[in-house]
Amino acid sequence: MPCGGRERGVCPSLDPLILRELFAGSTRFNEIKRGLPLISKTTLAQRLRALEDAGVVDCVDSPGSAYAEYRLTTAGAEFQSVIHALGAWGQRWTSRFDGKNLDAELLMWNVRRRLATDRLPAKRILIRFDFFGLPPRYRKARVFWLILEPPEVDLCLKDPGAEVDLHVSADLETFARVWLGDVALADAMQNKRIQLSGQRELVRRFPSWLLLSHFAGVERPGG
């Protein structure tokens, strides 16, 4: 789809996805790329440069780091309502997924950004996630760790080597449906599609930490 507006400005096919990542808190190139696994690094770099040229994004030095950061300009910030409306439309009108193209790593990257850090205990917590029911090509990526040190939350793909405080075992499709608001977490736990184990207090409080997708509350037709 050709770019609209100013030449090489905002491209309707990709830039809303990039802006979504920036609104979600990603600032560095690799963070943005991690949230957009189907976009090549070359294409992402080209679109970020185009957004800079259009006055939507600024590339700035990151204090104390060799890596640059991407920040929304005042003009870019005004896209927030547009991005939210597009996301709500997609949640309401696009067909439900069939479970064949689920990406556990992408799901966990989004979960990592949607934990209520203000509700977490003031201590370091390690949560291990084990997913089952993965599509064949993703079966190697079935275990993830979240390190919670409020207000920071880090996602690990390798065992951090520390004692696990809370263990989450879940069917991937069920967890994704919970994330999207299609299935209640309490129902998934009752049906044993999601199981929690570990420190009793953490098991009890985990449901209150999981904020779900920004669009989980959007009703679907006939829903």
Q: Residues of each region from the PLM?
A:
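Feature captures hydrophobic
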Residues: 38-80, 84-223
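N-terminal helix-turn-helix DNA-binding core of bacterial DNA-binding proteins
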Residues: 2-39, 70
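Short hydrophobic "helix-edge" motifs at membrane interfaces and signal-peptide entry regions
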Residues: 1-2, 171
